Amino acid sequence: FYAALTQYLGYKANSDEYRVMGLSAYGEPKYKEIFEKMVRFDEGNIINDNSFFAYHLGGDICYSEKFIEYFGPPCSKEECVDEKKYKDIAASGQELLNDLMVKIARWLRMKTGIQNLSIAGGVGLNSVANGKIYESKIFKDIWIQPAAYDAGCSIGCAFYIWNQLLNKKREFIMTHAYWGSEYKNDEYESAIKISKLSYEYYSNIE
């Protein structure tokens, strides 16, 4: 449902959901009851009312005419930022996601008895919903895969083969996500000078 909401608000589905999450902070969840008609969680099952959606029909549009009947015509990026109504729609969708995530987390804790939670998948990048799970104190520890979206599938595949299929010992523990390129100060300084930018140097950045 969040992908449909994202597209309805003028953004790219399955890509710009983070923009909707950010936009939701500027609205009020006035339309939450409508979103509750679309999707609910019941005893381990996520139940969608597909009459609100069109993504399963094979086209490019994720939301249906029924979605439009409830909320009105879709908006452009500019309109959703400027008009309060669309901010409220974003806030309502986010509020439902928060509730769903907490309900799922509570159900998992009850079913498994495990005190630690690991979150992955695209929705795992929704820091607002993750924060609600954290605040609920359902789990003792929560770990969120930094590459929670599709790119992280390769990590999961590699670990599955190594640990499960090859039965190899788990030697690597991920303690940070800072795996990018590393540069020295003189390289930074050279790039800044080439770009003719002003700068200040601090020896202590703590």
Which residue ranges define each predicted feature?
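Short acidic/glycine-rich loops and adjacent helix/strand connectors
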Residues: F1-E206
